[in-house]
Each structure stands twice: as structure tokens, then as C-alpha cells.
């Protein structure tokens, strides 16, 4: 929850409860780790990436994720996960 709260305070996401609940409930594998690492790395909101693939690439380059294949294979399995990856990816650039 703290990671999602920080990301919302920075303006990166605007639905921290949605993502915190999804992470805590285990609805998306590794989501909690993604949010925590992103919150440790991101200092401010920036323009989103155009695609989830670009977001994943930026997150890999920033050291936030090390499992790009998982995220590329699963970004369309949970509502708005693709948009989250775009937001986080843009913010780490």
C-alpha cells in the first residue's frame, strides 16, 4: 500500500487503492514487487510510454524489473495493467 500511495502522491498513478488491492490479493503475480521497486526508483511523473512494450523496456533499463517476458506475456490479463506499465515506464525514463 505504501508504494502505491507514493506513486499516487508523485502523480504517476491515480488509483492507488485499485493497484494496492490487486497486489495484496495476489491478482497479478509480482505486482507488489513491481510497485515497490518502481516507488523506490521513480521521483516524479513523466509522460507515459506509448505502448506497454516500451514501458517494459524502460522498466528493464531502469532496473525496476528483470522479468520482461512475464510482463510482455501478461500485460493484457488484468484490467489496466497495460496502462500501469506505460505510466511506470514513462516515469523511469
Regions found by a protein language model. Give the residues of each.
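Extracellular cell-wall/glycan-interacting regions and their flexible linkers
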Residues: 1-93
Amino acid at each position: 500500500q505504501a508504494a502505491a500511495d507514493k506513486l499516487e502522491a508523485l502523480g504517476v498513478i491515480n488509483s492507488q487503492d485499485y493497484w494496492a488491492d490487486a497486489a495484496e490479493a495476489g491478482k497479478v503475480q509480482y505486482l507488489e514487487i513491481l510497485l515497490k521497486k518502481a516507488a523506490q526508483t521513480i521521483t516524479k511523473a513523466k509522460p507515459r510510454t506509448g505502448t506497454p512494450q516500451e514501458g517494459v523496456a524502460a522498466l528493464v533499463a531502469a532496473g525496476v524489473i528483470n522479468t520482461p517476458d512475464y510482463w510482455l506475456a501478461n500485460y493484457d490479463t488484468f484490467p489496466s495493467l497495460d496502462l500501469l506499465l506505460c505510466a511506470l515506464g514513462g516515469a523511469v525514463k
